[in-house]
Amino acid sequence: MADGEESISVAWQSVLDKLETDDRITPQLHGFLSLVEPKGIMAGTFYLEVPNEFTRGMIEQRSRVPLLNAIGTLDNTLAVTTFAIVVNPEIQQESLSTVGEPEPTPAPYLDVATFTVAPPAEITAPPRNGDTRLNSKYSFDNFVIGQSNRFAHAAAVAVAEAPAKAYNPLFIYGDSGLGKTHLLHAIGHYAMSLYPGIRVRYVSSEEFTNDFINSIANNRGSSFQARYRNIDILLIDDIQFLQRAVETQEAFFHTFNTLHDHNKQVVITSDLPPKHLTGFEDRMRSRFEWGLITDVQVPDLETRIAILRKKAQSEKIQVPDDILEFMASKISSNIRELEGTLIRVTAFASLNRTPVDMPLVQTVLKDLITLDDDNVIAPTDIITNTAEYFKLTVDDLYGSSRSQAVATARQIAMYLCRELTNLSLPKIGQLFGGRDHTTVMYANKKISELMKERRSIYNQVTELTSRIKQNHR
């Protein structure tokens, strides 16, 4: 080994200094490198320790060449030509203790399997469950992990286990229907299970906007500030809908700053990464980039099969593996439509008291699986077709009538908008006369259940789907 721990530390610091000016090392990679502990130099190899396999993989895969270049600039007397990374979980807690007050740079990754922390500071009031806005059906336990979402899931768990100490903010982006909202709710539930008394609030950007507008109209600005600033974790969904909403952005900007300055966690989702978000000021986008940015992608076939299997288990229904694979191979656009295929198949089997087999699946899904994934269905087409099918007007569906015929048609239209488009629940609610997202959730759940109980409802949904998709071929 080289002489003394001090010379090893000096050599490693020299390497880090070189990497500071290397454009190939992103802020996130600097975070991973900060977890490295230099252990010694032997036979031309710089031995380094990290707390987990994930950190080792990130450094070896994304930093190898810059790291070798930096090592090559060390004093010739050290004779270092390469490096080796060893995983030592025992340094996990020590590396955690070095993560202090949040800075406008990313915190390093913290291994979700071994890492423990003290509760977040200043949790002063017990939560009121109604204020969290969390959906009980979304948890880490029923989140299916695959290559398309593994990193995002690990980051979400780390944030829940160490609010404002792992990544702050955590920014998750990707197309609608791929699990971003699921992760937000799961973070909230898991954090609350770990830290009794922690204050969590989930909100969509539309709801945040409406709250802000109402606070101005009712002269209740202080109440608005208290609602969003006197919390420990803010989970905000679909931030892209704040585009060009200048005053609302200003309100969110100050909310973000207050939470971040007081060591509170912020988690944000969007359909695009920060640098591609239009209609936002640079100062806002830069704050989105302070922590960790990660994405969720379209799940691969194996993950889609696992999602269907998990859904079938949760519904307590038996579906053969070959059926699950067939459905997963035909529906690849998003998780929402994937689960919708299972609902239709099991509803048809329940109505006819028949087992789920391949002929049944092919019959049920013949119209669902023939549409090209790239052929986007507009929600207005769904609403127009639904109105025509039930011999109603579009205004009837948008309006406030509670007659059985109109209410059922409206709920079916909401269900189809949820299944066949990428719109969020609040966005669908806005389409239907500015209704709350919980109304859409209720409609989606009710129609899913009625399809299993009433053949008329099942037939109406099936015929409407066929008509809508026929028009888009």
From Swiss-Prot:
The keyword Hydrolase does not apply. Coiled coil: none annotated. Residues 350-473 are annotated as: Domain IV, binds dsDNA. GO terms for biological process: DNA replication initiation; regulation of DNA replication. GO terms for cellular component: cytoplasm; plasma membrane. Residues 133-349 are annotated as: Domain III, AAA+ region. Oligomerizes as a right-handed, spiral filament on DNA at oriC. Domain I is involved in oligomerization and binding regulators, domain II is flexibile and of varying length in different bacteria, domain III forms the AAA+ region, while domain IV binds dsDNA. This is Chromosomal replication initiator protein DnaA.
